[in-house]
Regions:
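Charge-rich amphipathic alpha-helical interaction elements
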Residues: 1-199
Length: 199
């Protein structure tokens, strides 16, 4: 027996296996194409996450510096009062690449910008600290979105590679072996029928 479930006997089996091989070849082609696209996307998200991490690190250091300045000039109470005034809002836009959903856009609602009225109330160092923390928060969320996209694409890339190997290393060879056995069996049957007709 050939080990391929559902295969009809005889010439119909040869046709059936030929169709299955064509499907397997097309599946391997599509999976290979998906691997190439996902690999490019993974490289792109790797670069984006590295850049966003550097931006986040720089922005966090800047925010820390302004926090220290604001605390020294206006005290912790002024810093807390300024941050409670306008909470930030966040929205994520999603995109699908080759069947993989991942964060694509980060939208912000910071509330009103620090103005001269707040500068008079809290002091310019506090207003600068609040603005620096907004930038750092935005950079952190952008980095988190880039990392989430990278993880989603990398996970799908690994699954797709596994599927491609299953098709090319197991499914196609099994079908080719079965087709070779069917052809050999049909040739033997035709020879036996030819010998029987000659007698």
């Amino acid at each position: 027996m050939t080990g391929v479930r559902g295969m009809p006997p005889g010439r119909a089996g040869r046709v059936w296996l030929g169709r299955r091989l064509a499907v397997a070849a097309r599946a391997a082609e599509l999976l290979d194409q998906k691997v190439r696209v996902l690999r490019q996307e993974a490289e792109r998200f790797t670069l984006l996450s590295e850049r966003s991490e550097a931006e986040w690190t720089r922005a966090a250091q800047e925010a820390q510096l302004w926090s220290v300045r604001a605390a020294l000039v206006g005290g912790q109470a002024a810093l807390r009062a300024a941050t409670d005034a306008h909470p930030a809002g966040l929205s994520l836009g999603w995109k699908t690449t080759m069947g993989v959903s991942h964060p694509a856009e980060v939208g912000w609602d910071h509330g009103p910008d620090p103005s001269h009225v707040e500068a008079m109330t809290y002091g310019p160092a506090t207003v600068s600290a609040v603005a620096a923390h907004r930038v750092a928060l935005e950079a952190a969320v952008r980095h988190a979105a880039d990392l989430a996209a990278l993880r989603a694409v990398t996970r799908e890339l690994a699954v797709t590679r596994r599927r491609l190997r299953a098709v090319t290393d197991r499914w196609v060879p099994r079908l080719e072996d079965a087709l070779a056995q069917v052809r050999l069996g049909l040739e033997e049957t035709e020879r036996a029928e030819g010998v029987g007709l000659r007698r």
